[in-house]
Amino acid sequence: MNLRGFIKQAFIFCFFSFLIFLSSFNRLESAEIEWIEVAKTTNGIQFIDRNSIKYNNRSILSVLTKYSEINPDDQTIVSTNSYLMAIDCENRLFSKLPVNSKLDQVKNWDEPINDKLIKKTIINSCSY
């Protein structure tokens, strides 16, 4: 192969590599977290990331959630925890999982008995 052919192939390779590189930024941008407040009490605020909601082929979804504990005296945030919540929309059940988990890792489903934050999280998440 002559020098001209080599330069042409190198240019084509660089061009396509650049296109692949740029397309990865588009994916990162679309995966941006968008926290939406879904419930609040005097002791805490529950958020969901609307962009993280994923349904499986049944009526079960996963959503990234964030809970911020609030000091009731001065309304400052004391601590924040993020986790993945699996939600059975049909039966209004939930399961908390580590952030990088998958829906098939759900072992037990819980009812949101007397938990306003979880109930509202289920209702809001299932409305998407």
Residue ranges of each PLM-predicted region?
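N-terminal secretory-pathway/extracellular module detecting exported/lumenal segments
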Residues: F25-Y128
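N-terminal secretory signal peptides that target proteins for export/translocation
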Residues: M1-K8
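Short intrinsically disordered, low-complexity coil segments enriched in acidic
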Residues: M1, F21, N108-W109
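Bacterial N-terminal signal peptides
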Residues: A10-S23
